[in-house]
């Protein structure tokens, strides 16, 4: 998965950086990893703002050049410091691409491109905001995780997340339809009504019984996913139907600190169940 972007002697340092910085790989590269399919794509790395500079500096040490887009600060150190010194607003889950993203930084090396995506306060918020469920997969240092494996890997279907129609969404959905996934506006009725379905009316969380988790390291595979990834594993969500032609991956954000929050499934937030175990979140 990474050999296209890094030399052999750079892989172990990358893994150390990934663990130290909490970097998560997601996007089409991870879908290719799970399916064995191959198509042209960039490598998407997701990181919280406090670790942005360290992750970008590592890419530079591997020969990647920062390639700012129009309007971006042209020096990466200054750009990352600007974001760090300007506390991001707490985003609630919204129905447009980019929710939870502070900025995207492009790094290039020849014809290879890595996108370093700075997340405001929760990486999973960004992943759960993707256009459809087939790309809701990610890789940490020690585990590869598919959040909707039965749909994505078995039936090759993808539930479209509730996003207002726009050309970008249409193009993204068409691209994955061309790659073999059937796009669904609603979960199948039998799945939505079943407590045994990943698309049912159940509260989901990373590492639950519906996820497919592949350990990537021999030693660390002895430890459960949630023990090694507590910030990710403590988030939750649910599938909801929000209109005649739309469904959504639903959650609210509960703030823990300036640069940290958790996704909380909407039924939990509405019932304020988190208060029964002593958790205190702010949502505005």
PLM features: residue spans?
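Metal-dependent nucleotidyltransferase catalytic core
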Residues: 47-108
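Short, structured coil/loop segments at alpha-helix boundaries
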Residues: 1, 7-11, 162-170
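Catalytic cores of NTP-dependent nucleotidyl/adenyl transfer enzymes across multiple folds
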Residues: 82-284
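Active-site nucleotide-donor binding segment shared across nucleotidyl transfer reactions
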Residues: 2-58, 62, 68-72
């Amino acid at each position: 998965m990474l050999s296209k972007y890094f030399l052999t002697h750079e892989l172990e340092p990358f893994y150390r950086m990934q663990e130290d910085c909490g970097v998560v790989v997601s996007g089409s590269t991870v879908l290719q990893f799970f399916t064995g399919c191959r198509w042209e794509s960039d490598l998407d790395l997701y990181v919280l703002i406090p670790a942005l500079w360290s992750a970008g500096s590592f890419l530079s040490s591997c020969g990647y050049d920062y390639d700012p887009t129009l309007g971006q600060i042209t020096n990466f150190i200054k750009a990352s410091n600007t974001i760090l010194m300007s506390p991001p607003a707490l985003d609630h889950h919204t129905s447009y691409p980019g929710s939870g993203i502070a900025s995207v930084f492009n790094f290039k090396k020849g014809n290879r491109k890595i996108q370093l995506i700075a997340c405001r306060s929760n990486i999973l918020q960004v992943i759960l905001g993707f256009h459809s469920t087939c790309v809701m997969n990610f890789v940490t240092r020690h585990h590869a995780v598919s959040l909707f494996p039965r749909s994505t890997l078995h039936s090759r279907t993808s539930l479209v997340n509730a996003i207002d129609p726009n050309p970008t969404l249409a193009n993204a959905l068409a691209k994955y339809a061309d790659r073999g996934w059937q796009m669904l506006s609603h979960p199948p009725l039998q799945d939505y009504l079943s407590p045994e379905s990943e698309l049912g009316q159940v509260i989901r969380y990373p590492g639950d019984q519906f996820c497919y988790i592949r350990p990537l390291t021999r030693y660390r595979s002895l430890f459960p996913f949630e023990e090694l990834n507590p910030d990710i594993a403590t988030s939750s969500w649910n599938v909801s139907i929000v209109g005649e032609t739309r469904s959504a991956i639903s959650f609210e954000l509960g703030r823990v600190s300036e640069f940290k929050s958790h996704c909380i499934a909407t039924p939990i937030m509405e019932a304020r169940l988190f208060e029964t175990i002593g958790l205190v979140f702010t949502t505005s």
